[in-house]
Amino acid sequence: MVSCIGTDHAPHTPEDKANGAAGMVGLETAFAVCYTKLCRECGLPLEHVSALMSAGPAAVMNLPTKGLVAPGFDADLVLVDIDHMFTVDAAKLHSKSKNCPYDGQSFYGKVMLTLKAGKETFRSPEFAG
């Protein structure tokens, strides 16, 4: 049974990758890949995938104030437009690395806004809220 989905987000410079460093960019595409593949294509409920990507990792990492939207928890939120399809362009990723295996692939689930402890950390130019 799968209890969580996470990414170690291992960005490396092109030089590091040329020397065999393991890892890839994953943070910016993680939700869209999981939502498209698991929810849209395999039929898993969004609520289940959301829990696997929030409460699940918080439990595994023993982070008692993370993973839920509830009193006493940190206000860490991600707002997503699940109907927004986009094509990954590795050159436009915010990471220091551009080694993304999803470059050129299309996914649903565009992240529009992120909050960490209630403070805005990312806002898509396409977010109208």
Annotate each PLM feature.
Residues 3-5, 9-82:
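His/Asp/Glu-enriched, well-ordered alpha-helical/loop segment
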Residues 22, 71-126:
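C-terminal cap of metal-dependent C-N hydrolases
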